[in-house]
């Protein structure tokens, strides 16, 4: 982790674990290879597990995995029905995908902080490796921008371009003289949705990762479990809530896009 001949300090340890495996010069076009790899890996894991369960599903005595998946699907479906009152068969599958994918990416934060990076460095020569995709603002903002694109698409599709423009121009004050103020207010509100959606997930997961790193960096190895185990138990609640909040806000935003008034 430290350069050859250089003593490993707490500062260098923390810096090392907060550095991505990247391609580029650190500018806008820099690609974080590790975040992309683990986000795709968790996405494939979700697809393979659900495909396997769907393929082996039986009306008889279900397996434990089938019971778990059915409970998860029912939970998401009920959440969608309570929030989304339009007619769009894609919303529930989208909500399920978002919840499960983010949950799997968040769970990566429960893996011991040095386990995979140490193996990658010594076996493959990879100097830096961050395994929690949702602790990378590029991943969370990319997902939020995807939701934002769906919001705009369904707003125009359901209301028409003119109807959507009218909604922006005449809300909340239905008077021509207030159009400039309405536009400013609505555009700022619209842009704030994906920013808050992505930054909320990133902030919570990045903070959780930093706490694990600080525990590993500042406490002796024999005492690390005193801090890491209680925090990991509490962090399970955080990673679940953050996946649920992202899913629910996505459903709420898409429900607003399907309504004539909001």
UniProtKB/Swiss-Prot annotation:
It is a multi-pass membrane protein. Its main location: membrane. F-type ATPases have 2 components, CF(1) - the catalytic core - and CF(0) - the membrane proton channel. CF(1) has five subunits: alpha(3), beta(3), gamma(1), delta(1), epsilon(1). CF(0) has three main subunits: a(1), b(2) and c(9-12). The alpha and beta chains form an alternating ring which encloses part of the gamma chain. CF(1) is attached to CF(0) by a central stalk formed by the gamma and epsilon chains, while a peripheral stalk is formed by the delta and b chains. GO terms for molecular function: proton-transporting ATP synthase activity, rotational mechanism. It comes from Photobacterium profundum (strain SS9). Belongs to the ATPase A chain family. The keyword Cell inner membrane applies. It is found in: Cell inner membrane. This is ATP synthase subunit a 1. CDD domains: ATP-synt_Fo_a_6. The chain crosses the membrane at residues 30-50, 91-111, 131-151, 201-221, 232-252. GO terms for cellular component: plasma membrane; proton-transporting ATP synthase complex. InterPro entries: ATP_syn_F0_a_bact/chloroplast (IPR045082), ATP_synth_F0_asu (IPR000568), ATP_synth_F0_asu_AS (IPR023011), F0_ATP_A_sf (IPR035908). One of its GO terms (biological process) is proton motive force-driven plasma membrane ATP synthesis. Key component of the proton channel; it plays a direct role in the translocation of protons across the membrane. Keywords: ATP synthesis, Cell inner membrane, Cell membrane, CF(0), Hydrogen ion transport, Ion transport, Membrane, Transmembrane, Transmembrane helix, Transport. The keyword Ribonucleoprotein does not apply. It comes from the Bacteria.
């Amino acid at each position: 982790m430290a350069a050859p001949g250089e003593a490993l300090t707490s500062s260098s340890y923390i810096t090392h674990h907060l550095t991505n495996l990247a391609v580029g010069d650190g500018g806008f076009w820099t690609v974080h290879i590790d975040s992309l790899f683990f986000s795709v890996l968790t996405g494939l894991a979700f697809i393979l597990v659900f495909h396997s369960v769907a393929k082996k599903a039986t009306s008889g005595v279900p397996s434990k995995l089938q019971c778990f998946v059915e409970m998860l699907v029912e939970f998401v479906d009920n959440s969608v029905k309570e929030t989304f009152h339009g007619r769009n068969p894609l919303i529930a599958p989208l909500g399920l995908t978002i919840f499960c994918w983010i949950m799997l990416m968040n769970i990566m934060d429960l893996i011991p902080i040095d386990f995979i990076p140490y193996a990658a460095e010594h076996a493959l020569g990879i100097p830096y490796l961050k395994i929690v995709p949702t602790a990378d603002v590029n991943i969370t903002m990319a997902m939020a921008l995807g939701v934002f694109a769906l919001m705009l698409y369904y707003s125009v599709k359901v209301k028409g371009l003119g109807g959507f423009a009218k909604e922006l121009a005449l809300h909340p004050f239905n008077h021509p003289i207030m159009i400039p103020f309405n536009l400013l207010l609505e555009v700022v509100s619209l842009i704030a949705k994906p920013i808050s959606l992505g930054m909320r997930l990133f902030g919570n997961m990045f903070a959780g990762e930093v706490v694990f790193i600080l525990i590993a960096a500042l406490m002796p190895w024999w005492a690390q479990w005193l801090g890491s185990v209680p925090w990991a138990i509490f962090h399970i609640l955080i990673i679940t809530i953050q996946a649920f909040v992202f899913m629910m806000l996505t459903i709420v935003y898409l429900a607003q896009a399907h309504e004539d008034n909001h």
